Structures are given as structure tokens and as C-alpha cells.
């Protein structure tokens, strides 16, 4: 009798621990350190410091895992029960996927697990910008070559399946509201960077087809914005 009870207890413990070991041993998932949600500059000061920077990026220097964790949580992390986020989302879609491009590879942020899913170990940072050409024909915006050496680029991809073909006043609002959702996330990143003294810029002009191909996106997944983060030039 005692042996059967012990056996049952051991079996129950084993079954309970399976999810833990599965997650811990999954080489394609990187658990981020818990975000530091205290401190930082006051909101009004961060707003005063918020700016777009392209020509003042310093030499490549990797962000620490803690800084990356804090930044991604600020972007669209879970900040209260029921998996509600730091960024608002039209119709509660939460349809913006945040791809993370660093020198170490390409990752997909999982806000519910606060983890990174490994997509590729290839350095694809360069495709988040337009290399060797102006951002728009005849524009004075300059090139986006900085993207290939900046320590971090975020690529915002809209999962259009989550919009469910929603219409408002007879018009499909999927793309427009997805841009609004991505804009809210990007502003969170801007404010975090302002608070932490990091340089940052958002861009809508990039090779979307190349991104979709490299990331192996489904037709329903639309790359819409990229945002590059770096240290300021000293």
C-alpha cells in the first residue's frame, strides 16, 4: 500500500514537472530576465527627451539582456492580470508581432511568456533598413545603413488573421488599426529609450518583401514598421 502511494506521488510530481523541463530544455526559447518595472525618468522628462535619431548612433555595443528585457516589456509586455499589456490595442486584437534582430540572430518576442523564440541565428539587421540609398526617391532623409550595425532593430509585423476582417462604417479597418497598434508600441519604446539614454528611430520605408521572405512570413502577416535602437555617439 505504501509503495503504491509513493509511486503515485512520484508519478504526479513527474507529470507536474514535465512542462518546466520542456521549457527549460527548449533550445529555441530564451527566457528573458524579469523586467525591472521600477525607476527610470519621470514621464514628463522622458517626453521632453524623446527624439528620433539616425546620424548620432554610436559604435555597435550589445544591449544587456536586462535592458532588452526591460525594453520589450515596455514595448508590449504584460502589466496586469488577464494578460493585459503596456500598449493599447484596437479591438483587443494584440496582433502586432515584435521581431527582434540583433548580431546574434532573429527572434520573436513572446509577451505572455516574456521570452524570445529563436527564428534564425543569422544576422539579418541590415534588412530592417534601406542600404546604400535614400529612404525615399528625392528625399533628404539620407540612407539607413545604420541599421546593419545598430545593436537592435525591432520589426513590427501585423497578423491580419486576428483582425477577422473587421469593418467600420463599411470599410475594412485592419491595416489602419494595425498601424495604430504598432504606433502605440513604438512610442512605448521611444519613451523607454528616452528614459535610458538610448538613441532610437522608427521607419516605415524598408524592403517589406525582403523582410517577409527572410522571416518566412505567411501571406496574412504584414511587416509594417521597423524601429532601430542604439547608444548615442560619444
Regions found by a protein language model. Give the residues of each.
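Small-aliphatic-rich amphipathic alpha-helix that forms the alpha element of a beta-alpha
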Residues: 50, 71, 98, 152-160, ...
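Short, surface-exposed loop/helix-turn segments at secondary-structure junctions
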Residues: 130-134, 167-174
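Sec/Tat signal peptide C-region and signal peptidase I cleavage site
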Residues: 20-24
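Bacterial N-terminal signal peptides
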Residues: 8-19
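Positively charged n-region of N-terminal signal peptides that target proteins for export
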Residues: 1-4
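N-terminal amphipathic, basic helical "cap/leader" segment at the start of enzyme domains
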Residues: 25-150
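Active-site/binding-pocket entry motifs
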Residues: 160-162, 233
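A glycine-rich helix N-cap at a beta->alpha junction
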Residues: 217-234
Amino acid at each position: 500500500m505504501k509503495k503504491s502511494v509513493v509511486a503515485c506521488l512520484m508519478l504526479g510530481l513527474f507529470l507536474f514537472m514535465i512542462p518546466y523541463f520542456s521549457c527549460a530544455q527548449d533550445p529555441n526559447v530564451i527566457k528573458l530576465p524579469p523586467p525591472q518595472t521600477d525607476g527610470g525618468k519621470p514621464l514628463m522628462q522622458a517626453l521632453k527627451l524623446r527624439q528620433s535619431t539616425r546620424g548620432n548612433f554610436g559604435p555597435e555595443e550589445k544591449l544587456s539582456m536586462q535592458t532588452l528585457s526591460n525594453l520589450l516589456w515596455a514595448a508590449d509586455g504584460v502589466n496586469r492580470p488577464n494578460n493585459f499589456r503596456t500598449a493599447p490595442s484596437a479591438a483587443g486584437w494584440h496582433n502586432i508581432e515584435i521581431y527582434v534582430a540583433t548580431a546574434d540572430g532573429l527572434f520573436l518576442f513572446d509577451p505572455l511568456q516574456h521570452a524570445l523564440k529563436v527564428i534564425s541565428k543569422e544576422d539579418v539587421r541590415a534588412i530592417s533598413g534601406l542600404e546604400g540609398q535614400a529612404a525615399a526617391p528625392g528625399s533628404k532623409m539620407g540612407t539607413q545603413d545604420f541599421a546593419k550595425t545598430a545593436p537592435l532593430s525591432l520589426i513590427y509585423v501585423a497578423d491580419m488573421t486576428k483582425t477577422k476582417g473587421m469593418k467600420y462604417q463599411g470599410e475594412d479597418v485592419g491595416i489602419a488599426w494595425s498601424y495604430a497598434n504598432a504606433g502605440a508600441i513604438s512610442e512605448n519604446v521611444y519613451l523607454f529609450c528616452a528614459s535610458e539614454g538610448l538613441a532610437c528611430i522608427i521607419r516605415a520605408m524598408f524592403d517589406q518583401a525582403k523582410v517577409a521572405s527572410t522571416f518566412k512570413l505567411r501571406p496574412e502577416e504584414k511587416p509594417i514598421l521597423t524601429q532601430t535602437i542604439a547608444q548615442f555617439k560619444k
